[in-house]
Amino acid sequence: MNISNYYWHFKSAIPPKICDDIIKYGLTQAETMARTGGYGDKELTKDQVRDMKRKRNSDLVWLNDTWIYKELHPYIHQANKAAGWNFEWDRSESCQFTKYKLNQYYDWHCDSWNKPYKKEGLDNGKIRKLSMTCQLTDGSEYEGGELEFDFRNYDPHIREETKHLKQAKEILPKGSIIV
């Protein structure tokens, strides 16, 4: 898909107190091993866990609380319009509150699939069009964790592959959002 804006950001949009409240709440919820989309909810073998952890090694909590969506959704709507995407959307998947311990990571991945979801419930038949990241902790409080985008609009015969990568430094301050 050709679009003129690959992402839209809001610097320090969410107040620090709300960020702290989300963190405090997320830390009280039961966590699970984070998975990538291809592994679903099925029981994994040791080999499957090892393969998955090559791409993603972190823990997460699923949050779908109205008070959190009320803070985040206005920015998604605003970005969708301001960036000129104008996607139709009527709901969000559960938020992933991800916990990274020392040396954990989430490597390169695409946030959408080429086919609609085939599962029970409200996501059935839908495709993720928009993804959002909210920086709950100030970027000065940890090392690593850079959010990079791969726009895939490069020709390896013309320029180096790394020249198409964009690091989203706009969202380092606490409370910043990128859609």
Q: Which residues fall in each region the model found?
A:
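Fe(II)/2-oxoglutarate oxygenase catalytic core
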Residues: 1-177
